Structure formats: structure tokens, C-alpha cells
């Protein structure tokens, strides 16, 4: 969906940023599972040649990553309009005591998604 930024560019932009003020955007699509959780669809191949040669031998063109209840709610809230602080407040209202400490858990989860190139922050896109 979005162009990946290089390691040094991402690091430069986020060096002085407050994580709660960043606006996350998903880089991949998703599908809903039966229980209401989200399954993220990560493309198996990036290059056209490998996709053309190897894809016909495989069942699915995607690697499917299933998220738990909290992860699913946060993934759905990452719409590019809400910053992390707003998402934390929304999750606290939606899940109550089950999510506490909300800021720590959600920022750690989004940091992991960002490090695995599953999300990007709008502020990085503005700098490109």
C-alpha cells in the first residue's frame, strides 16, 4: 500500500518524535476471522519474477498473521486519522481494566508492528 522508507530515514524522523503523537497506518490488508479477530495478509513475494515463478506452486499468495483480541482492536483503529494517544484512550474505554497499562502495551505492540514493516507512521510519509 505505502512505499517503505529506509532504515536511516525512519530513524531520523522518529528520533525526536513523541510516540503517542504519531499516526499509524497499516501497510497490508486484512480479513476478519470467525471470532471477530483480524488476520493480517502479508504478501509472500515482493518481486515480479519470484511471484511469477514460485507463486503458482503455493496455495496462497499471502502469509496470514492472526492477531488476538487486543491486537485486532488496535489494528482496526489504525486508520491514519487517529494518533496513538487517541487509540489508547479508545481502547481503554472499549476494554476497561483488561488493557491496563494501555499506553505501555499499545506502544509496545505498535513498535513491534513497525519494526516488522506491518505499519508505517503518517509522519514518515510526510517527510518523503
PLM features: residue spans?
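Intrinsically disordered, low-complexity serine/threonine- and proline-rich regulatory segments
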Residues: 39-40, 44-63
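Long, charge-rich, low-complexity alpha-helical segments
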Residues: 1-20, 56-128
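Hydrophobic packing positions characteristic
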Residues: 1-47
